[in-house]
């Protein structure tokens, strides 16, 4: 699914690219697996902005994804690979042999007609979901649970994966996409393989309008605001903030750790993620 560059017929097209979606085999989603999706504009129930730079965008319907993969022992055939506007990865429509239909994240090299299965007895093949205790060390997995039965929470974005690097007792050590090494209970489930649509990171949006279609609003620098709006604001012309970089609420930013101290999950983290810019 490579990215296609446009000819520079306009300033917006000059620096833009799109995914070809060669692997997408079905355009219309399965109606029984759709749900309403209400936009919040980044506001909470009181109407206050809790997440900045969100709002607008094309209307969407949510695709109900099976992150638990708890239908054990029943084979399922991949009926289609579909586009999902709510995530960077594509999704696969499964037709179980008992008649049920479900969506899962589409791993790389999973094609229409492939047969997948979930459960402790499943083989270690691409698209199969099974407990980490039954997956060999060194295997690449995605859609990993943090707690048994809670559903996949790790390595769900396009092109991401985690690797099993050790097993000790009831705990399995994973190397996550960020570089963090973390222990997870062996009963937690994971799906074998790498999340597909890895070319998503190569897309160049080209113009602001394409980001607005995604529901992403502009990010304004604090130094061009008024003093009432940001600690960096005000001054005559282009002026320096005169202080260390801070958030709009005055908290130190650009490198200061924001993780809470003494979290319960600290005991499960072997090594924190690599510092610096991540892609």
From Swiss-Prot:
Here the segments flagged for biased composition (Polar residues) are 12-22
Q: Name one GO molecular function term.
A: structural constituent of ribosome
Q: How does it assemble?
A: Part of the 50S ribosomal subunit. Forms a bridge to the 30S subunit in the 70S ribosome.
General function of this protein: One of the primary rRNA binding proteins. Required for association of the 30S and 50S subunits to form the 70S ribosome, for tRNA binding and peptide bond formation. It has been suggested to have peptidyltransferase activity; this is somewhat controversial. Makes several contacts with the 16S rRNA in the 70S ribosome.
GO cellular component terms, semicolon-separated: large ribosomal subunit
- Entry's HAMAP family? Ribosomal_uL2_B
Q: Keywords of this protein's UniProt record, alphabetized?
A: Ribonucleoprotein, Ribosomal protein, RNA-binding, rRNA-binding
| Stored Gene3D superfamilies | 2.30.30.30, Nucleic acid-binding proteins, Ribosomal protein L2, domain 3
Signal peptide bounds: none
Sorted alphabetically, which PANTHER family does this protein's record hold? LARGE RIBOSOMAL SUBUNIT PROTEIN UL2M (PTHR13691:SF5), RIBOSOMAL PROTEIN L2 (PTHR13691)
Name the gene behind this protein: rplB
Q: Name one GO biological process term.
A: cytoplasmic translation
Can you say what this protein is called?
Large ribosomal subunit protein uL2
Q: Signal as a keyword?
A: no
Region entry Disordered, spans: 1-28, 221-279
Which NCBIfam families does the UniProt entry name for this protein? rplB_bact
Which protein family is named in the record? Answer: Belongs to the universal ribosomal protein uL2 family.
